[in-house]
Amino acid sequence: MFPPVEIMDTTLRDGEQTSGVSFNAREKLSIARLLLEELHVSRIEIASARVSQGEQQAVRAIAEWAAAKGYADRVEALGFIDGGVSLDWLGTAGCRVVNLLAKGSRKHCEGQLRRTPERHLEDVRAEILAAVDRGMKVNLYLEDWSNGMRRSPDYVYAMLDGLADAPVSRFMCPDTLGVLDPYDTERFCRDLVERYPSLRFDFHAHNDYDLAVANTAAAVRAGFHGVHVTVNGLGERAGNAPLSSAVAVLHDRLGRTTGIDETKINRVSRTVESYTGIRIPANRPIVGASVFTQCAGIHADGDSKNNLYFNELLPERFGRVREYALGKTSGKANVLKNLEALGIDLDEAAMRKVTERVVELSDKKEQVTAEDLPYIIADVLRYDPVDTPVRILNYSLSLAQGMHPVATLRIEIHGCAYERTSAGDGQYDAFMRALRQIYREQLGREFPMLRDYTVSIPPGGRTDAFVQTIITWEMDGREFKTRGLDADQTEAAIKATVKMLNIIEINYTDNGC
């Protein structure tokens, strides 16, 4: 039985080296809490020493929280071989574990430091002992280790020989430039495990050749004890190994345990996405918006017949649900799945007509979503216009320089009219505040959580171009999207919101007005 693989998340240190990404102290503490308390990663790396006063304050806040929770030994920070300057900086911030950065290749040692390997080894040993004297635990990075193993393995062995008896908890082996493939990764890692069976090794992947996850798995297969990841694959250049994919591969393909709570992965990924402003690609495994969406009708049909198109990556594992897209490759099965979710039942002839219309609209490059189905049904079956339970009677939005925007809303819900006025940080925010007041104060009902808000405008630069707003909502643990289209962005958002209201009001018939 293999021991659990240690997952060290370096989103707050290496992930912050992504171009355009910078976390403030509050965001760092929030992410640290999610990683340790919800995801249950083994360790986190939260900062580099000597960056700024603000960074030191962030380290102090996390260190104080971690100490109070009993997590102090699971919070680490990067330090340098600089005669104790980094150690003083981290010690002042309350950090108890330092990840010292040594050179893992002869080229880096001689070319960047202008040191002989022997002198560098002396400096590293002195820094390790200085950290221990300060009561700190030490891990050691061998920067550019992958190129060291490729071009100067004798240098790597000399470093490890000289430090094997030093008080180092883990030797951390980075593929700093992302040059390894899984075959070399496994070969180099196994070499170290066999040469130094008493030492603990971590592998730190970079994704320049899109091999970070494969290399991470190869390192564990070779016997490494821990791996480094980041949420959403953040990191220098092409990024690091994404936590979501690395954990899934270790669990499913290698049969290893990590202690990670998979059901929290999606939530943590979305939180980090909101802090960084870097969108998760829709097709990113595990956490992308489209990865649990079946588009082909044959897949939806197979899922209805003993789950023929399922694999081990079930969406429920990651706190998500399977969806079925509507488009020109959709068959009757996709339409049926969406109608079932809406609680609508059609006969065979009606189903065929609706499916044909969905394909026709998709051929015209029109996007069809589940909330459009009632309107499509009304059109193709010549029903009266859909009797929507929610109608906007009128509203007023005001915007003045130096003042908060104000919205006055009058809305009809199941025949009852309600009116509210509210200020907000923007016109749509004011509209939503007024709407929430109606739901919570007058209806006494919960209101969906707005999870995501995206706006797209066709290329061309015209000020009168149509704006498409897609809003993701969450209610009762279920996420769904609505879409609005208008030349005005706020109007588009309001249209998407009204569609959401008509979806949630299906289950209500009378407000008692």
What are these regions (language model features)?
Residues 2-7, 13-43, 64-70, 83-139, ...:
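Alpha/beta enzyme core
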Residues 4-11, 250, 254-421, 461-468:
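A mid-to-C-terminal "edge-of-domain" accessory segment
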Residues 12, 48-49, 80-82, 102-105, ...:
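Short, ordered loop/turn segments at secondary-structure junctions
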Residues 17-18, 22, 27-31, 36, ...:
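Non-catalytic terminal/interface segments that mediate subunit docking, oligomerization
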Residues 50-70, 75-78, 82-87:
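N-terminal active-site wall of soluble small-molecule enzyme domains
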Residues 109, 175, 228-236, 248-260, ...:
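Short beta-alpha connecting loops at secondary-structure transitions
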Residues 177-180, 184-305, 309-311:
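Catalytic alpha/beta core domains of metabolic enzymes, predominantly
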Residues 479-513:
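Mixed-charge, glycine-accented linear interaction segment located at domain edges/termini
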